[in-house]
Amino acid sequence: MFEKIICHDENKKLFEKCIHGGNISHAYLFFGKDGIGKCTFAKEFAKELLNVENLDSSTEYKYISRLEGKKDIVIEQIRKELIDDVYERPLSGNYKIYIIDDAQYLNISAQNALLKTLEEPPDYVVIILIASSMSYFLPTII
């Protein structure tokens, strides 16, 4: 598990324990400098939860990031890619995983729209926010 991840030994141990113990949270915030492996770690975690080798072939996985040429991740994008989909139960497996990369670009409206799902998610949903800092988020998100 997490063989492709270099370093991050403490995090690997923690997440392995969570997976084996069935103690999976509905939301995670991975933050830190660019290039330290946050997205790679999130994707490996998603692979473990979904029991797949290739996330792109899984119907239970969505990767969300800023659309090309856009300054922010806007409410319409969050509604379309996450909120409209989140209440459909997984077709296979126990989880639906949503990774929001560069989540610091979620504008205020998008954060507010996401808040209800973060506060009252379906039991099968895991949302992973990836950002350079926590300071970009509304206090209610953190």
Residue ranges of model-derived segments:
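His-Asp phosphorelay/catalytic-motif detector in bacterial-type signaling
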Residues: 122-126
